Amino acid sequence: MFFKLLRDAFKVKQVRSKILFTIFIILVFRIGTTITVPGVNAKILNNLQDVSFLNMLSLVSGNAMRNFSVFALGVSPYITASIVVQLLQMDLLPKFVEWGKQGEVGRRKLNQATRYISLVLAFVQSIGITATFHTLSQAKLVATPNTKTYLLIGAILTTGSMIVTWLGEQITDKGYGNGVSMIIFAGIVSSIPEMIKEIYENAFVNVRSGQMTNSLIFVGVLILAVLVIVYFTTFVEQAQYKIPIQYTKIAQGAPSSSYLPLKVNPAGVIPVIFASSITAAPAAIFQVISAMGYNAGWVRTAQAMLATNTPTGVAMYALLIILFTFFYTFVQINPEKTAENLQKSGAYIPGVRPGKGTEEFMSRLLRRLASVGSVFLGFITIIPILARDLFGLTDAVALGGTSLLIIISTGIEGMKQLEGYLLKRKYVGFMDTTTE
């Protein structure tokens, strides 16, 4: 099905251009991830494999952190800024609430505010992360660790983050899929060969002949787990809850009844990306505070709460995923606007009063769907982390669930967008033919 869809897509010039443009932008991003920041010994980071937040940062940055490239921050600051702006729209700042109701004009203002906030966050985060890794590497990361060097590295990483954000926006506007998700998707896909190599070396290299059976069983269970995650994720991402809709006024040729489809997991994979981004950056800051010798109780507590290799950290990560799932579900689908749009189009849900009654019905339904979505996302992301801690597995396995979730969800969304565009073109072409 995928290859047939791709073949059909490449037959249409406009669709082909969009696909090739997306691939081109991803290639530009991948080239940028190979350019190491000047004055930094990136090989030192290979000695920090056991630092959990480094692996999380690498995931969110699209695998650009491993060699401390100019794109090392990736879209992480933009993601954090987006969360801040969306929170400010929830009756926290009147100006942001007002912009949220101004349609396209307000959206442009909110996007501008997001960019300014992400610029500040990127600069602070870049200096914090550089100082963290320099301290953890026993002062070997930065060649000349002075104020001027840190400011220069901060400026380079901030500029790189802004470029990556711009590349993501180009994909969203002119290519296919969500730009932020596609950037992270590309980074994860590029790291798959390295993940496979790491798992192979741990399972088979320098293993005694008597332990070979255990290694084969381990790899077999791992492959089975991957297949289960792929099937389960594909099923949930494509599952829909259909709300029956009826119309009071039937236009000529219009159906008397229809349905409103809602995804079983309306938030998609965004809550996991949000939670990963929120967890990784503060963990780096607290790590450097601790490494500098400031080991107050609250610092140790904060480290435990944000590190995904501690029970408290895993619980916090799961809680963040749950909270962001509920939050982003209501960002994606506004019950008030849905009720208003149904009423304007002369549609209603059988057994539910239009207006306020429909809004309350949608709110209850979205809470139930968000509950299902949070359990699903939590299961896929947390179980591999627990398996790592219980069986002494690598971080490649621990973050494998999150990586697979992002790959599959982004792939499905891209295919749906492509399929929808082809269907729309076919429908428009048919209408043009019938009117001639």
Positions of PLM-derived features:
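N-terminal cationic and glycine-rich segments that engage phosphates or anionic surfaces
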Residues: 1-98, 105-436
